[in-house]
Regions:
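Short, solvent-exposed loop/turn elements at beta->coil junctions and helix N-caps
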Residues: 36-39, 92-94
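Short, small/polar residue-rich loop motifs at catalytic or cofactor-binding pockets
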Residues: 41-46
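A short acidic/small-residue loop/turn micro-motif
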Residues: 65-71
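Intrinsic-disorder/low-complexity signature in envelope-associated proteins
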Residues: 1-25, 31, 35-38
Length: 111
């Protein structure tokens, strides 16, 4: 079973904790990659979907809505792939589904 979590989805406590950890990992890796590339970004927004299995493996990463900038889109996918694997699911989450699709808008702004 697959659970899709969008920005406006109602989530359980376990899912909220999982999303918080996931987001912190993404932001940490994103900050490192952006600093390492020393690129100044214009204001760009990209919508990504990360498909994660119950073990925390990233099984698919895709751009749902492009920023219009191929470099920004590629950076978003690179961040997802370098941040993986993520934490395994909480047992309550595993009881409900084996795959999680997280859909989020990511904003890239100049430093």
């Amino acid at each position: 079973k697959i659970k899709k979590l969008q920005a406006n989805s109602t989530v359980t406590n376990e899912e909220a904790m999982y999303l918080n950890l996931w987001q912190r990992e993404i932001e940490s890796i994103g900050d490192e990659l952006i600093a390492a590339n020393d690129i100044e970004y214009t204001n760009s927004k990209v919508q990504v979907m990360a498909t994660i299995d119950s073990f925390g493996n990233l099984i698919k990463s895709e751009i749902l809505i492009s920023s219009g900038n191929t470099y920004v889109d590629k950076m978003a996918i690179d961040i997802l792939e370098k941040a993986a694997p993520f934490a395994p699911f909480d047992p309550k989450m595993i009881n409900e589904y084996g795959i999680l699709e997280i859909i989020r808008d990511w904003n890239f702004t100049p430093r």
